[in-house]
């Protein structure tokens, strides 16, 4: 449907609404699919008119369109189901379950089983997730809030939530204007004409009764005397000027079109086809409009530029970005305020410095999470940073996923040098996917599910040689990946399947960049080559529509401003001269050339657009800014120095933060006032859940990974906590605790003190501590862990019972995270049944308790010398038990790619790879001599590391479970081997370095060869190490001792920086010797940890003050290293 036909539908909708044809209005909204009436939808949901709700939705989306749609339908049907259960109408509930909810079982079988189990409960509120379910009215209100977020984030609803700004009775106005115009054409106009029909054109009859031919069959006349007009058909505003005909963005870029296009005369009404040379090239379109075609009023175009439109209020800036805050409007007209900007809005203040470790080649801010930055480097590494908290959430090195399927040329290239640089990184429009273009043939597409959850999605052997650029596009609402490369081609790939859809050939030099875009009904791709040629392509096989030269025949990239109405390019010629220009798309000519770039640039200058107002470029060791409407340089900043000649840079969608590369392989984050406020708030963790960083969002207990991977929305059974961002819900599978949700913080300069001193804490006033409330039988805590959400702590006691403490959201604890200020609740089900492991008679000292928590916090696998038990963390129910001893389980770990597979260390020295789903041991690994006491997976290296009571480390390949390496831990002199010693292992967040915890020492080994990198042997006065763990950012190590003390070490050097004495947190006069038997680190707060005591108590410990830290790391030149033994032949000094 053409744009004007679409607007006619809006006029009809307005007319029907004004005439009170309510049912017809909503039916037309649904059948056209042009406008989603949020108010009507809210009313229908509130009234519980579920059939009407689903019928209305069906005009805009289907259940399986994408994850957002799936979750919308799931929430509605789940509410229907719960209401039927609440009314004790089990027959209806079963009908809803079978006919409406069963469709979701394909995507999350466990969730469907959980929902089915509700039928067995007397009151479904007995289920912990539904314990907060109130009455029907409040439940619908909570659900409605969730649905609105999902609809606003769903790309299928883009531009359908905003009704155009129209004057009242606009259709009547147009009819009156038409009648007045027809009356002016009458040969004998009457002063007061009588209108009896609109079905035929109006004419005033001749005195003799003859009629004038219809004006549609006559040419327009010249000047006609003004005569009295018709009385208006209804209230309307003053006469509207006829809008200028739309000029297409590609028309002027065709100096030699291959098709002859007829001239279209624009009539005064403008309801005909637009005057467009590209109208002949239009392809048949689906009923729904493209996702980035905005519905707005036309304005008269100026003489130099293409037609400009204001953005509807509430749609966030950014080309091809999902509108996450679109506000529903009603039919009456609404004026749009145009934002004003000043130089104070420019992000120029250095607020963060991040250390990446290698030269930055490309960056891109997340389209929804405004403080999340994707980075690619010259060594092939990619990383996702949460810049607010200075946390590196994810890191990946270059690795071909499936070399066997690659071309012979690529295999040969990798054989000579297995490295590749990143040329481009970019997020998909909704942030659910990210793409990486490498300097060797390859494109990687990952699916991102929040926090550290990054999964391989597609590996494409895309081009011969360099893949120079990559972009996402959505032709006809199909998510695609557009690539270009050294082989002079542009290719389009299906982002879901990886199938190649188009190959565009025509450039005579390597293609440097691509810029997909959409104007009106035209979807196209601009491409630029290193010889300065610019071409444009439609998604067909008709060849290039444009052949033009960039200024200076420069190596150029192109970009649109945020609302897609203005086109800019930036490039650097072979001689080093750089150009930033604005293009007049209607003529294919440069409209404006900006001044202030250097004449001898080193490398290609990179640029970006900021909202719809500013341009920014990295040039001459500076960041330079221009107002889009002025050619003169507006402002510049050196960002406190340290920038390369032509730095890489990127601005976030809101224009509040700017990332720029530095010469020392780092990134500086520049901010304006609003950006500084956001960063400061996140640093203090004083955020509500709607602004919480990814990975710290409260994750639903039962979450599914549904639909295609271009979104990260999951489904949950729970009712109580729905305030987190829709796009950050994490999936169920891929359980793995080895990659925590935060990454290293950058130390402040103030911390680099030259006069270093060990921080000794001996009084309660020097820290914050909280002993968790406990009314159950006290028993020694043997295992302790935080839930992945950070809102609860799970302990396993010596008596085989589990205890779970949960922190609730409150005014004192906005995020509901574990802390030492607010006491948690000891969680117990209404049945009073605890999660208790199976046990066996025998010596307690022979038992090695162990447990592992699934990543979504829904399940815990646990053993205490007897069978292994799988518990549901929501209900405390025992899901299953298996593997009765002997042998007994002594260590457990979930497989990182499949939470149905677990590695089980046994007391007979074997390791069993067990598939829970089929109840089968897949492999049995033998390499240890004594019981296995530690297991840790590395996703990066694709290995499993094990440790045992034999003080031996082993590395096993996850592909075939062969042993790759083994190493004996070096026991210092004076320490006799303890046959009951529990050696534990934990991977650093880089997934390469392994922390080895032994009663005699801490050590860092590098996998997979198990090279001993560092060793720390505590002083004898400290006693033996009982447990140790990395902090969540892997910058510190918390080590507990049997003298009651806790030592905090710098992870990179194993140097002691803080020691917490037992008197600062333990009871002053204990009746017996009490010390921490186990320690756990908070998953997102680097300075918080918890200890489980031998008296059954659990303490949460934090430094004093909101910004407190555990001492200062010793500078290398200070020489304050770890205490080591002097035994010959031992690995004594840190290396």
UniProtKB/Swiss-Prot annotation:
Residues 1119-1135 have a biased composition (Low complexity). One of its GO terms (biological process) is negative regulation of transcription by RNA polymerase II. Its main location: nucleus. The modification Phosphoserine is found at residue 214. GO terms for cellular component: nucleus. PROSITE patterns: CTLH (PS50897), LISH (PS50896), WD_REPEATS_1 (PS00678), WD_REPEATS_2 (PS50082), WD_REPEATS_REGION (PS50294). Keywords: Nucleus, Phosphoprotein, Repeat, Repressor, Transcription, Transcription regulation, WD repeat. It comes from the Eukaryota. SMART domains: CTLH, LisH, WD40. Residues 4-36 form the LisH domain. The keyword Nucleus applies. GO terms for molecular function: transcription corepressor activity. Residues 290-303 have a biased composition (Polar residues). Pfam families: LisH_TPL (PF17814), TPR1-like_2nd (PF21889), WD40 (PF00400), zf_topless (PF21359). Residues 281-303, 1095-1135 are annotated as: Disordered. Gene3D superfamilies: YVTN repeat-like/Quinoprotein amine dehydrogenase. Residues 34-92 form the CTLH domain. The keyword Repressor applies. It is found in: Nucleus. Tetramer. Interacts with WUS (via the C-terminal domain). Interacts with SPL (via EAR motif). Interacts with SPEAR3/TIE1. Binds to and corepresses GAF1/IDD2 at the promoter of GA20OX2 gene. The N-terminal TOPLESS domain (TPD) (1-209) binds directly to a 12-amino acid LxLxL EAR motif peptide. This is Topless-related protein 4. The lineage of its organism: Eukaryota, Viridiplantae, Streptophyta, Embryophyta, Tracheophyta.
């Amino acid at each position: 449907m053409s744009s004007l036909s679409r607007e006619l539908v809006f006029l009809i909708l307005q007319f029907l609404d004004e005439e009170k044809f309510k049912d017809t209005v909503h039916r037309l909204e649904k059948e056209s699919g042009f406008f989603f009436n949020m108010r009507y939808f809210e009313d229908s949901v509130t009234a519980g008119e579920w059939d009407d709700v689903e019928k209305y939705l069906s005009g805009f989306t289907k259940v399986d369109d994408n994850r957002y749609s799936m979750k919308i339908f799931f929430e509605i049907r789940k509410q229907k189901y719960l209401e039927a259960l609440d009314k004790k109408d089990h027959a209806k509930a079963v009908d809803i379950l079978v006919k409406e909810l069963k469709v979701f079982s394909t995507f999350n079988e466990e969730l469907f089983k959980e929902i089915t189990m509700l039928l067995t409960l007397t009151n479904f509120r007995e289920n912990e997730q539904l314990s907060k379910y109130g009455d029907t009215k409040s439940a619908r209100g909570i659900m409605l809030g969730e649905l609105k977020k999902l609809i606003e984030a769903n790309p299928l609803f883009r531009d359908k939530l905003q009704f155009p700004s129209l004057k009242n009775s606009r259709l009547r106005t147009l009819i009156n204007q038409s009648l007045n115009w027809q009356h002016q054409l009458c040969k004998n106009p009457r002063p007061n004409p009588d209108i009896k029909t609109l079905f035929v054109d109006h004419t005033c009859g001749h005195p003799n009764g003859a009629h004038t031919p219809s004006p549609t069959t006559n040419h327009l006349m010249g000047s006609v005397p003004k005569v009295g007009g018709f009385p208006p058909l209804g209230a309307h505003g003053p006469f509207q000027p006829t809008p200028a005909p739309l000029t297409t963005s590609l028309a002027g870029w065709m100096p030699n079109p291959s098709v002859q296009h007829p001239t279209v005369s624009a009539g005064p009404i403008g309801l005909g086809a637009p005057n467009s040379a590209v109208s002949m090239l239009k392809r048949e379109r689906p009923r729904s409009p493209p996702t980035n075609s905005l519905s707005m009023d036309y304005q008269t175009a100026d003489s130099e530029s293409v037609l400009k439109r204001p953005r509807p209020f509430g749609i966030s800036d950014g080309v091809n970005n999902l509108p996450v805050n679109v506000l529903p409007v009603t039919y009456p007209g609404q004026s749009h305020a145009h934002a004003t900007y000043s130089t104070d809005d420019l992000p120029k203040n250095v607020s963060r410095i991040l250390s990446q470790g290698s030269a930055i080649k490309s960056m891109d801010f997340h389209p929804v999470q405004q403080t999340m930055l994707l980075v690619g480097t010259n060594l092939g590494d990619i990383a996702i940073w949460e810049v607010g908290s200075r946390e590196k959430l994810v890191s990946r090195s270059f690795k071909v996923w499936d070399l066997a399927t690659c071309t012979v040329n690529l295999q040969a290239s990798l054989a000579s040098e297995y490295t590749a640089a990143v040329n481009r990184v970019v997020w998909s429009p909704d942030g659910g996917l990210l793409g990486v273009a490498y300097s060797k043939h390859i494109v990687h597409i990952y699916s991102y599910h929040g926090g550290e959850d990054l999964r391989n999605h597609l590996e494409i052997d895309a081009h011969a040689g360099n893949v120079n650029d990559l972009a996402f596009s959505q032709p006809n609402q199909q998510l695609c990946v557009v690539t270009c490369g050294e082989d002079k081609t542009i290719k389009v790939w299906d982002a879901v399947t990886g199938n190649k859809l188009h190959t565009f050939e025509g450039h005579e030099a390597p293609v440097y960049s691509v810029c997909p875009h959409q104007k009106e009904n035209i979807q196209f791709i601009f491409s630029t080559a290193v010889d300065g040629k610019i071409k444009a392509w439609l998604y067909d096989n008709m060849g290039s529509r444009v052949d033009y030269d960039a200024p200076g025949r420069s190596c150029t990239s192109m970009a649109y401003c945020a609302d897609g109405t203005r086109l800019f390019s930036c490039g650097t010629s072979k001689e080093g001269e750089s150009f930033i220009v604005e293009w007049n798309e209607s003529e294919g000519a440069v409209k404006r050339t900006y001044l202030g770039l250097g004449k001898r640039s080193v490398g290609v200058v990179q640029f970006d657009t900021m909202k719809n107002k500013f341009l920014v470029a990295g040039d001459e060791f500076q960041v330079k800014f221009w107002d889009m409407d002025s050619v003169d340089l507006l402002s510049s900043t050196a960002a406190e120095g340290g920038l390369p000649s032509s730095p890489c840079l990127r601005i976030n969608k809101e224009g509040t933060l700017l990332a720029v590369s530095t010469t020392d392989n780092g990134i500086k984050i520049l901010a304006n006032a609003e950006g500084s406020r956001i960063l400061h708030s996140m640093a203090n963790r004083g955020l509500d859940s709607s602004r919480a960083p990814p990975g710290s969002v409260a994750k639903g207990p039962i979450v599914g990974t549904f639909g295609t991977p271009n979104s990260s929305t999951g489904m949950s059974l729970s009712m109580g906590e729905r305030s987190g961002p829709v796009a950050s819900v994490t999936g169920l599978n891929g359980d793995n605790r080895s990659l925590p949700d935060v990454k290293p913080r950058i130390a402040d300069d103030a911390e680099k003190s030259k006069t270093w001193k060990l921080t000794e804490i001996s009084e309660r006033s020097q820290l914050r501590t909280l002993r968790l409330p406990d009314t159950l039988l006290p028993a020694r805590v043997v295992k302790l862990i935080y839930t992945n959400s950070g809102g609860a702590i799970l302990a396993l006691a010596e008596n085989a019972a589990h205890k779970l403490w949960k922190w609730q959201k409150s005014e004192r604890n906005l995020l509901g995270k574990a802390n030492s200020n607010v006491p948690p609740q000891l969680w117990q089900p209404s049945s009073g049944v605890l999660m208790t492991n199976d046990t066996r008679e025998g010596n307690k000292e022979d038992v090695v308790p162990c447990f592992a928590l699934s990543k979504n916090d829904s399940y815990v696998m646990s053993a205490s010398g007897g069978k292994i038990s799988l518990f549901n963390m929501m209900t405390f129910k025992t899901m299953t038990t298996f593997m009765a001893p002997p042998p007994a389980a002594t260590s457990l770990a979930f497989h990182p790619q499949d939470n149905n597979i677990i590695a089980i260390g046994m007391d007979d020295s074997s390791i069993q790879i067990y598939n829970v789903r089929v109840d089968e041991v897949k492999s049995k690994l033998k390499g240890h001599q004594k019981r296995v006491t530690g297991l840790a997976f590395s996703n990066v290296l694709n290995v499993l590391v094990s440790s045992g009571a034999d003080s031996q480390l082993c590395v096993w390949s996850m592909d075939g479970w062969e042993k790759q390496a083994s190493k004996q831990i070096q026991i210092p002199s004076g320490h006799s081997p303890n046959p009951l010693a529990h050696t534990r292992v934990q991977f650093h967040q880089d997934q390469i370095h392994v922390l080895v915890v032994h009663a005699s020492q801490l050590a860092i080994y590098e996998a997979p060869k198990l090279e001993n990198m560092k060793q720390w042997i505590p002083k004898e006065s400290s006693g033996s190490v009982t447990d140790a763990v990395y902090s969540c950012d892997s910058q510190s190590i918390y080590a507990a001792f049997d003298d009651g003390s806790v030592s905090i070490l710098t992870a990179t050097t194993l140097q002691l920086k803080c020691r917490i004495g037992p008197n600062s947190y333990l009871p002053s006069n204990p009746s017996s010797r009490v010390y921490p038997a186990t320690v756990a680190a908070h998953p997102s707060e680097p300075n918080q940890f918890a200890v489980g005591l031998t008296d059954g108590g659990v303490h949460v410990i934090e430094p004093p003050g909101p910004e407190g830290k555990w001492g200062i790391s010793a500078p290398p030149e200070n020489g304050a290293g770890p205490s080591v033994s002097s035994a010959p032949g031992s690995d004594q000094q840190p290396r």
